[in-house]
């Protein structure tokens, strides 16, 4: 026996709803999580460079030729050490490369690198906002497809 047309329409609406929900959860939310994770890593890198800038600025202010410090060898195992010349510093350029720079050169590099990282984080923020807008649009489409009414937005107090 054939199913009535109204029943088939409900089945196709239900199938569309399931496909849209699967697209939202499998694609859009996964993409959003990847973008947000990448942005968090960029923020961590930016934080490290800003900490390095603070250290370099303190070194320039104190004008000491020697520096006594503790170095973490890993697993929170520290050793005391003495840096005989604080006029030059090794900076991680990326991809495993390090370069010996003067403090002024290191500050220039940090400024450039931090501006690039800030631009990248801004771009990733825009990407995440676009994905969130797509998710919202898909949810609105689902609401219309299911015939649900918009619920009033809670007013901020």
Swiss-Prot record:
GO terms for biological process: centrosome cycle; microtubule cytoskeleton organization; negative regulation of transcription by RNA polymerase II. Its main location: cytoplasm. InterPro entries: Prefoldin (IPR009053), Prefoldin_subunit_alpha (IPR004127), UXT (IPR003994). Coiled coil: none annotated. GO terms for cellular component: centrosome; chromatin; cytoplasm; cytoskeleton; mediator complex; nucleus; RPAP3/R2TP/prefoldin-like complex; spindle pole. Keywords: Activator, Chaperone, Cytoplasm, Cytoskeleton, Nucleus, Repressor, Transcription, Transcription regulation. Involved in gene transcription regulation. Acts in concert with the corepressor URI1 to regulate androgen receptor AR-mediated transcription. Together with URI1, associates with chromatin to the NKX3-1 promoter region. Negatively regulates the transcriptional activity of the estrogen receptor ESR1 by inducing its translocation into the cytoplasm. May act as nuclear chaperone that facilitates the formation of the NF-kappa-B enhanceosome and thus positively regulates NF-kappa-B transcription activity. Homohexamer. Component of the PAQosome complex which is responsible for the biogenesis of several protein complexes and which consists of R2TP complex members RUVBL1, RUVBL2, RPAP3 and PIH1D1, URI complex members PFDN2, PFDN6, PDRG1, UXT and URI1 as well as ASDURF, POLR2E and DNAAF10/WDR92. Interacts with LRPPRC. Interacts with androgen receptor AR (via N-terminus). Interacts with estrogen receptor ESR1; the interaction relocalizes ESR1 to the cytoplasm. Belongs to the UXT family. This is Protein UXT. It comes from Rattus norvegicus (Rat). The gene is Uxt.
